[in-house]
Amino acid sequence: MIDETLFDAEEKMEKAVSVARDELGSIRTGRANPGMFNRINIDYYGSMTPITQLASINVPEARLVVIKPYEASQLRAIEDAIRNSDLGVNPSNDGNIIRVAIPQLTEERRRELVKQAKSKGEDAKVSVRNIRRKAMEELSRIKKDGEAGEDEVSRAEKDLDKSTHTYTAQIDELVKHKESELLEV
């Protein structure tokens, strides 16, 4: 029972770090990156579909993204979705492909994006801490019900604390990396 609780908590913490990695990856840095379009969804015959399933996304130059829809009929919808997203870019299409020029980030915008990255990192750390809290509650229930001895539960709590520290450190590292990426001119 203790092992299941620890395994479950580890799995959820891993998922929280993965979500943080994806969220931080979607923050624009001033360089072209296909990952910045991951959160954009397009209405495709009545269902919201990720842009990555409707078009190929390539980066031929450091500041240019080329998006080629698999269906020409989706060109306008993809262009509108990119324009209406929070990326701050202006796509242009030539009838076959969409070109997205990535503008230089201003100092003010960089600072804004750093704040956004820190906020997403903090949200992920809160998520990890909530997972830890729930696992600790489960461990104390196990101890109270007599399903395991005090020593076993104490050892499990230490392991849980170690895992929590490891995953929050990973999140801090991701945020630090993103921050340096954003502030790099």
From Swiss-Prot:
Biological processes, Gene Ontology terms:
translational termination
Name the keywords, alphabetized. Answer: Cytoplasm, Protein biosynthesis
A cellular component term, taken from the record's GO annotations: cytoplasm
GO MF annotations, alphabetized: ribosomal large subunit binding
Q: Where in the cell is it found?
A: Cytoplasm
Annotated region Disordered: the residues are: 142-164
Q: Which Pfam families match?
A: RRF
Chain's role:
Responsible for the release of ribosomes from messenger RNA at the termination of protein biosynthesis. May increase the efficiency of translation by recycling ribosomes from one round of translation to another.
What family does the entry list?
A: Belongs to the RRF family.
Name of this chain's protein: Ribosome-recycling factor
As recorded in Swiss-Prot or TrEMBL, the protein's gene is named frr
